[in-house]
Every structure is written in structure tokens, then in C-alpha cells.
């Protein structure tokens, strides 16, 4: 998946620990909203690194945990009007689209995140301009069966697919872990500074 293939981010000299962005120490600010703007700046820096490594474009979407999305909303930089008509409702069980940062970077919430992280990625306007491709063999197949316990009819659905890396990223198409330049991931620590 994207999260396992992404290169480690937050490698700039301004971060105390490589691969980890600590909101308390790595961003400068007098109060939380200013420190959260430092997190937005780190996302922009990762987007710039993607542009330099791929020569295709800056990162244009973020996959993050719900706490990171809440921090982005608290920074005042996340426009949640496209996502919600009233206000950002960061909820792991609801819609995963949280909003847009600075009018160009879409933010999605990972409902299965166990820790705080952010992954910046790039996908171009062309469907072939991406870091990974979903390749279905059988789009969707319905299977009918009878339950062993109560002999009630059951319906199941299955699909077969493959995930392959962009062939211009990896020569063999397998997508080595932590090597795809279309994605940058880093851990976010100390959100509640």
C-alpha cells in the first residue's frame, strides 16, 4: 500500500529526529495554532521534495490520522467547506475527506491509523501519472452459498486485483518498501503541546 511504499520524510536538518516531526520542538510558535502552522509548512516541504524527486509535480494530497487532521483544522489553514457544509467533523467512522490545505492539497483521514502520522503524495491529472496502480483482474464476483449452521442462503463477494508501482519509479514494478518517490511519510509527535 501507499503507506508501506512511501519514502521516509521529515529528513530536513530542521527536524530533531529524522522521520519524526515533533510539533513541540520542530515548529516554532507562541501558541498551538502557530505551532500547527509549522506542521502545514512541513507538509509543504514534503510536497516540494516529491516535486524535486519525480519532476512531475508537487505533492497534492495528504493521508493522515484524525488528530493530525484536527491540528490542521486548528491551524486555520484547512478549508473544510468543500468537505462539510457546517464545520470539520473529524470522525474516523464517517467521511474520510477532511478538506483542502491552501486551496490545493486535499486532506484525507485514515480511519485505521493507530498512531499520528502524515503521508504526502502526488497524483497527476492523467490516470497514469501516479506512484501506484490498482489493477483488477476480476472487478467483482458474486458467490452464492448455503450456510452450514442454519441452511440459510448466503451471498459473498470477492475480487482479485494487483497493486503495482509505476514502472518509471521501480524497474521491476514490485515497489520496494520505503522507496517510492511519489509518497513521503513521517510520524507526528507531541500534537498536544
Provide a role label for each language-model segment:
Residues 26-49, 60-61, 67-193:
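Sequence/fold signature of self-assembling virion shell proteins
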Residues 1-45:
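Alpha-helical scaffold segments that mediate packing/assembly in large oligomeric complexes
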Residues 1-11, 55-62, 151-159:
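Long, contiguous amphipathic alpha-helices that act as assembly "spine/axial" helices in icosahedral shell
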